[in-house]
Amino acid sequence: MTTFPTARDVRTTPEGLLWEPSERWVRGRKGDVTVVDSRHPVLVWEPDVPVPLYAFPRADVREDLLRPAKNPATGTHTGSRIFYDLEVDGELVENAAWTFPAADLAGHIAFAWFRRWGTGLDHWYEEEEEIFVHPRDPHKRVDAMAGSRHVRVEIDGTVVADTHRPVLLFETGLPTRYYIPREDVRLDLFEATDHHTDCPYKGTAEYWSTGGHANILWSYPDPLPAVAAVKGLLAFFNEAVDITVDGERLERPVTPFTGTVE
Protein backbone atom coordinates (compact mmCIF):
# COMPACT_ATOMS: atom_id res chain seq x y z
CA MET A 1 0.00 0.00 0.00
CA THR A 2 1.39 3.39 -1.00
CA THR A 3 1.25 6.12 1.63
CA PHE A 4 1.00 9.68 0.39
CA PRO A 5 2.18 12.49 2.68
CA THR A 6 -0.41 15.03 3.82
CA ALA A 7 2.23 17.76 4.32
CA ARG A 8 5.34 18.81 2.47
CA ASP A 9 7.56 15.72 2.30
CA VAL A 10 10.90 17.51 2.22
CA ARG A 11 14.16 15.98 3.43
CA THR A 12 17.39 17.79 4.31
CA THR A 13 20.97 16.78 3.49
CA PRO A 14 24.05 17.59 5.61
CA GLU A 15 25.13 20.26 3.10
CA GLY A 16 21.83 22.08 3.47
CA LEU A 17 19.99 20.85 0.40
CA LEU A 18 16.24 20.31 0.56
CA TRP A 19 14.76 17.61 -1.63
CA GLU A 20 11.61 15.63 -2.26
CA PRO A 21 10.49 13.01 -4.77
CA SER A 22 8.30 14.05 -7.70
CA GLU A 23 5.83 11.98 -9.69
CA ARG A 24 6.14 14.09 -12.85
CA TRP A 25 7.46 12.55 -16.04
CA VAL A 26 10.42 14.75 -17.00
CA ARG A 27 12.47 14.72 -20.18
CA GLY A 28 15.40 16.86 -21.27
CA ARG A 29 16.73 17.18 -24.82
CA LYS A 30 19.80 18.57 -26.50
CA GLY A 31 18.93 19.09 -30.14
CA ASP A 32 17.08 15.96 -31.20
CA VAL A 33 18.76 13.77 -28.58
CA THR A 34 16.90 12.85 -25.40
CA VAL A 35 19.47 13.07 -22.59
CA VAL A 36 17.09 12.58 -19.65
CA ASP A 37 13.87 10.55 -19.51
CA SER A 38 12.64 10.00 -15.97
CA ARG A 39 9.43 9.12 -14.17
CA HIS A 40 11.22 9.30 -10.82
CA PRO A 41 12.86 12.73 -10.62
CA VAL A 42 13.79 14.45 -7.39
CA LEU A 43 13.25 18.17 -6.80
CA VAL A 44 16.22 19.85 -5.09
CA TRP A 45 16.38 23.28 -3.44
CA GLU A 46 19.85 24.72 -2.84
CA PRO A 47 20.59 27.05 0.10
CA ASP A 48 19.45 30.63 -0.58
CA VAL A 49 18.20 29.71 -4.07
CA PRO A 50 14.41 30.26 -4.29
CA VAL A 51 13.75 27.98 -7.26
CA PRO A 52 14.25 24.21 -7.47
CA LEU A 53 16.14 22.02 -9.92
CA TYR A 54 15.80 18.36 -10.81
CA ALA A 55 18.08 15.43 -10.07
CA PHE A 56 17.51 12.11 -11.82
CA PRO A 57 18.36 8.46 -11.16
CA ARG A 58 21.45 7.49 -13.15
CA ALA A 59 19.46 4.86 -15.00
CA ASP A 60 17.30 7.64 -16.48
CA VAL A 61 20.26 9.63 -17.84
CA ARG A 62 22.32 9.03 -20.99
CA GLU A 63 25.57 8.69 -19.03
CA ASP A 64 27.35 7.64 -22.22
CA LEU A 65 27.08 11.30 -23.28
CA LEU A 66 28.72 12.65 -20.11
CA ARG A 67 32.45 13.30 -19.65
CA PRO A 68 34.38 14.44 -16.55
CA ALA A 69 34.35 18.24 -16.70
CA LYS A 70 37.51 19.81 -18.16
CA ASN A 71 36.92 23.03 -16.22
CA PRO A 72 34.72 22.19 -13.21
CA ALA A 73 32.55 25.02 -11.93
CA THR A 74 33.61 26.78 -8.75
CA GLY A 75 31.85 29.17 -6.42
CA THR A 76 28.61 29.24 -4.48
CA HIS A 77 26.97 25.85 -3.89
CA THR A 78 29.55 23.90 -5.90
CA GLY A 79 31.15 22.35 -2.81
CA SER A 80 32.48 18.86 -3.41
CA ARG A 81 30.20 18.15 -6.33
CA ILE A 82 31.53 16.34 -9.37
CA PHE A 83 30.76 18.13 -12.63
CA TYR A 84 30.33 16.63 -16.08
CA ASP A 85 30.48 18.00 -19.59
CA LEU A 86 27.87 16.81 -22.07
CA GLU A 87 28.86 15.85 -25.61
CA VAL A 88 26.11 15.48 -28.20
CA ASP A 89 26.77 15.20 -31.94
CA GLY A 90 30.21 16.74 -31.55
CA GLU A 91 28.99 19.70 -29.46
CA LEU A 92 30.46 20.00 -25.97
CA VAL A 93 28.33 21.56 -23.22
CA GLU A 94 30.53 22.40 -20.24
CA ASN A 95 29.33 21.65 -16.70
CA ALA A 96 25.95 20.51 -17.95
CA ALA A 97 25.46 18.05 -15.10
CA TRP A 98 26.79 17.12 -11.68
CA THR A 99 26.40 14.75 -8.76
CA PHE A 100 25.87 15.71 -5.12
CA PRO A 101 28.08 14.43 -2.27
CA ALA A 102 25.04 13.87 -0.03
CA ALA A 103 24.33 10.19 0.60
CA ASP A 104 20.59 10.86 0.26
CA LEU A 105 21.12 11.88 -3.36
CA ALA A 106 23.72 9.27 -4.26
CA GLY A 107 22.90 7.68 -7.57
CA HIS A 108 21.31 10.88 -8.90
CA ILE A 109 22.55 13.34 -11.53
CA ALA A 110 21.40 16.97 -11.62
CA PHE A 111 21.17 19.25 -14.63
CA ALA A 112 21.20 23.04 -14.69
CA TRP A 113 18.09 24.74 -16.03
CA PHE A 114 18.83 28.38 -15.26
CA ARG A 115 22.37 28.19 -16.64
CA ARG A 116 24.55 29.38 -13.79
CA TRP A 117 27.04 26.75 -14.90
CA GLY A 118 27.40 25.77 -18.55
CA THR A 119 24.67 26.24 -21.12
CA GLY A 120 22.32 23.43 -20.15
CA LEU A 121 19.96 21.47 -22.37
CA ASP A 122 17.79 22.97 -25.10
CA HIS A 123 14.34 21.73 -24.08
CA TRP A 124 12.71 20.40 -20.93
CA TYR A 125 9.29 18.78 -20.63
CA GLU A 126 7.06 17.92 -17.69
CA GLU A 127 4.54 15.41 -19.03
CA GLU A 128 3.73 16.87 -22.49
CA GLU A 129 4.28 20.55 -21.60
CA GLU A 130 7.55 22.31 -22.40
CA ILE A 131 8.87 24.08 -19.30
CA PHE A 132 11.12 27.13 -19.29
CA VAL A 133 13.64 28.77 -16.94
CA HIS A 134 13.35 26.32 -14.03
CA PRO A 135 11.10 23.51 -12.77
CA ARG A 136 7.79 24.61 -11.31
CA ASP A 137 7.72 24.53 -7.53
CA PRO A 138 4.76 22.33 -6.46
CA HIS A 139 4.45 24.42 -3.28
CA LYS A 140 4.02 27.71 -5.12
CA ARG A 141 0.70 29.13 -6.33
CA VAL A 142 -0.11 31.65 -9.02
CA ASP A 143 -3.73 32.85 -9.23
CA ALA A 144 -5.22 35.45 -11.59
CA MET A 145 -8.54 36.88 -10.39
CA ALA A 146 -10.83 39.47 -11.96
CA GLY A 147 -11.38 42.45 -9.67
CA SER A 148 -13.29 45.71 -9.33
CA ARG A 149 -10.84 47.68 -7.20
CA HIS A 150 -9.92 51.19 -8.20
CA VAL A 151 -6.25 51.03 -9.18
CA ARG A 152 -4.25 54.10 -10.12
CA VAL A 153 -0.59 54.07 -11.16
CA GLU A 154 1.72 57.09 -11.12
CA ILE A 155 5.25 57.52 -12.43
CA ASP A 156 7.08 60.65 -11.31
CA GLY A 157 3.76 62.23 -10.36
CA THR A 158 2.05 61.51 -13.69
CA VAL A 159 -0.98 59.21 -13.72
CA VAL A 160 -0.21 56.54 -16.32
CA ALA A 161 -3.03 54.10 -15.54
CA ASP A 162 -6.47 54.31 -13.91
CA THR A 163 -8.91 51.41 -13.84
CA HIS A 164 -11.83 49.82 -11.99
CA ARG A 165 -11.42 46.48 -13.77
CA PRO A 166 -8.01 45.06 -12.95
CA VAL A 167 -7.03 41.43 -12.88
CA LEU A 168 -5.10 40.73 -9.68
CA LEU A 169 -2.28 38.21 -9.93
CA PHE A 170 -1.29 36.57 -6.66
CA GLU A 171 2.04 34.71 -6.77
CA THR A 172 3.69 33.11 -3.75
CA GLY A 173 6.59 35.21 -2.51
CA LEU A 174 5.84 38.26 -4.67
CA PRO A 175 3.60 41.32 -4.24
CA THR A 176 0.19 41.38 -5.88
CA ARG A 177 0.52 42.48 -9.50
CA TYR A 178 -2.29 44.56 -10.96
CA TYR A 179 -2.96 43.77 -14.62
CA ILE A 180 -4.80 46.61 -16.32
CA PRO A 181 -6.74 46.77 -19.62
CA ARG A 182 -4.85 48.63 -22.32
CA GLU A 183 -7.67 51.14 -22.68
CA ASP A 184 -6.98 52.26 -19.11
CA VAL A 185 -3.22 52.77 -19.58
CA ARG A 186 -1.55 55.83 -21.15
CA LEU A 187 0.33 53.72 -23.68
CA ASP A 188 1.06 56.88 -25.65
CA LEU A 189 3.65 57.65 -22.95
CA PHE A 190 5.48 54.36 -23.46
CA GLU A 191 7.67 52.81 -26.12
CA ALA A 192 7.87 49.09 -26.84
CA THR A 193 11.29 47.50 -26.36
CA ASP A 194 12.85 44.26 -27.60
CA HIS A 195 13.20 42.98 -24.03
CA HIS A 196 11.49 39.67 -23.21
CA THR A 197 11.48 37.42 -20.15
CA ASP A 198 10.28 33.86 -19.59
CA CYS A 199 8.41 32.59 -16.54
CA PRO A 200 7.58 28.90 -15.96
CA TYR A 201 4.26 29.90 -14.37
CA LYS A 202 3.05 32.67 -16.70
CA GLY A 203 4.82 32.47 -20.07
CA THR A 204 6.80 35.01 -22.12
CA ALA A 205 6.43 38.73 -21.38
CA GLU A 206 7.01 41.73 -23.61
CA TYR A 207 8.01 45.16 -22.25
CA TRP A 208 7.65 48.94 -22.61
CA SER A 209 9.77 51.82 -21.32
CA THR A 210 9.04 55.47 -20.56
CA GLY A 211 11.44 58.34 -19.93
CA GLY A 212 14.29 57.07 -17.78
CA HIS A 213 12.33 54.00 -16.69
CA ALA A 214 13.42 51.01 -18.76
CA ASN A 215 11.16 47.97 -19.13
CA ILE A 216 8.86 49.10 -16.34
CA LEU A 217 5.63 47.92 -18.01
CA TRP A 218 4.93 44.42 -19.31
CA SER A 219 2.30 42.14 -20.77
CA TYR A 220 1.81 38.45 -21.53
CA PRO A 221 0.40 38.23 -25.09
CA ASP A 222 0.02 34.46 -24.87
CA PRO A 223 0.07 33.44 -21.19
CA LEU A 224 -0.03 29.89 -19.92
CA PRO A 225 -3.55 28.50 -19.32
CA ALA A 226 -3.36 28.88 -15.52
CA VAL A 227 -3.19 32.68 -15.86
CA ALA A 228 -5.15 33.14 -19.08
CA ALA A 229 -7.06 36.03 -17.49
CA VAL A 230 -4.03 38.36 -17.84
CA LYS A 231 -3.77 37.89 -21.62
CA GLY A 232 -2.93 41.21 -23.25
CA LEU A 233 -3.30 43.20 -20.02
CA LEU A 234 -0.55 45.48 -18.72
CA ALA A 235 1.26 45.44 -15.37
CA PHE A 236 3.80 47.66 -13.64
CA PHE A 237 6.61 46.89 -11.22
CA ASN A 238 5.23 47.82 -7.78
CA GLU A 239 8.87 48.24 -6.76
CA ALA A 240 9.37 51.25 -9.06
CA VAL A 241 6.02 53.05 -9.43
CA ASP A 242 3.40 54.50 -7.08
CA ILE A 243 0.22 52.41 -6.95
CA THR A 244 -2.96 53.50 -5.18
CA VAL A 245 -5.68 50.90 -4.57
CA ASP A 246 -9.12 52.07 -3.42
CA GLY A 247 -7.61 55.30 -2.19
CA GLU A 248 -4.73 53.70 -0.26
CA ARG A 249 -1.18 54.35 -1.48
CA LEU A 250 0.78 51.09 -1.43
CA GLU A 251 4.31 50.95 -0.11
CA ARG A 252 6.92 49.99 -2.65
CA PRO A 253 7.86 46.40 -1.76
CA VAL A 254 11.39 45.05 -1.51
CA THR A 255 11.73 42.01 -3.77
CA PRO A 256 14.38 40.33 -5.93
CA PHE A 257 13.39 42.87 -8.61
CA THR A 258 14.19 45.87 -6.40
CA GLY A 259 17.09 47.74 -7.94
CA THR A 260 16.75 45.97 -11.28
CA VAL A 261 14.03 48.39 -12.41
CA GLU A 262 13.85 52.13 -11.79
Specify the residue positions occupied by each region the protein language model found.
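Terminal leader/tail segments of proteins
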Residues: 1-262
